[in-house]
Amino acid sequence: FDCCNGTREKVEPVDENMPIYDALAKKYLNINCSVMSPNNSRMQYIDEMIDEYQVDGVIEIILQACHTYNIESHYVKQTVTNKGKSYLMIETDYSQADKGQIHTRLEAFLETLEK
């Protein structure tokens, strides 16, 4: 749900009262992406989503080539566990090779949520 093309880019609309290029630059430079460091706004956004959607656990899926998200996963885990929620990080290249392993890890994670 919180991914590069997910809800995050829709949180703050483009300011239509500014010159268009300035407004677009402001919009894109304020998207809480892991390449923008420090990225405290993403942790705040995750914290708010946990409360808003009353989740029991968070699954973070990281594309293997996205090193900044991989590094940031430490902070995501910290944010989630500080709220007393379960956390699972899955790193994948979206190929079929790790399909079975991911399935097993998801099943185990869901079992822990049921307890």
Residue spans of the language-model regions?
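Conserved beta-strand positions
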Residues: E60-L63
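Redox- and metal-dependent alpha/beta enzyme cores, enriched for Fe-S-associated oxidoreductases
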Residues: F1-P38, R42-Y45
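A short, acidic, amphipathic alpha-helical segment used as a generic capping/interface helix at domain edges
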Residues: S37-Q54, I71-E72
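Peripheral docking tails and interdomain loops at the edges
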Residues: H74-K115
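Residues that form generic nucleotide/phosphate-binding pockets
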Residues: K27-Y28, M49, R105, T112
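Flexible loop/turn segments at secondary-structure boundaries
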Residues: T7-V11, M43-Q44, A65-Y69, Q96-D98
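Histidine/acidic-residue-rich catalytic or RNA/ligand-binding cores of hydrolases
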Residues: P13, I71-H74
